[in-house]
């Protein structure tokens, strides 16, 4: 069994309660009949997502058969209230397929609150502090074979959240993080709700961190960076430019703070 995607991303930012629907396909690549004993949402009835299979909506479907070479559409709907203070920045669930003792998963991600979302994109200019910023994948200030010599300036009081495996990447460009004593800039994970056994803020390695490659002159001031894989990594090679750190606190990184 295979699916047309391993992650379904609902990248609509809601300003009022709303819903949207996306779909993917499930394929039977084998010569025999594929028997899906169950297809369900990991969060079950607690999920904001709903699945539609063959015109029926629900959170659990059982005993589905696909003929050899056949496929089926699976529609997924999510309803989000961005004003719900208990929602995480990124609302995640999974569709779990059980077939002949094997498990296959498709991850579901939707924006849970009103924020600036940077999804695998080139970034420059100014990041304001009026809403949180969420990095999903790579937010790149310059990128090999695409762009360089750019500048990203981050205002005092800005909060930046990194999704799992996400990175702020600075390639032959400048990063200016302008925190102050009373309004520091904070980089941290996007998961703010606690895990079952641990507070969310105690778990390291929840996002990749800030990575500089041959940076132009950059500065980071009055900033906290926490719970990354590596807080700040600087690959200068033959570049004589500097990254100036002033009143920067880096803690709880998985491998190294700096």
Where do the PLM segments sit?
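Short, solvent-exposed loop/linker segments at beta-strand-coil boundaries, enriched for Pro/Gly
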Residues: 40-60
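Asparagine-centered strand-capping/turn motif at beta-strand->loop junctions
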Residues: 26-33
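Beta-strand/loop edge motif enriched in small/polar residues
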Residues: 2-12, 17-18, 23, 56-258
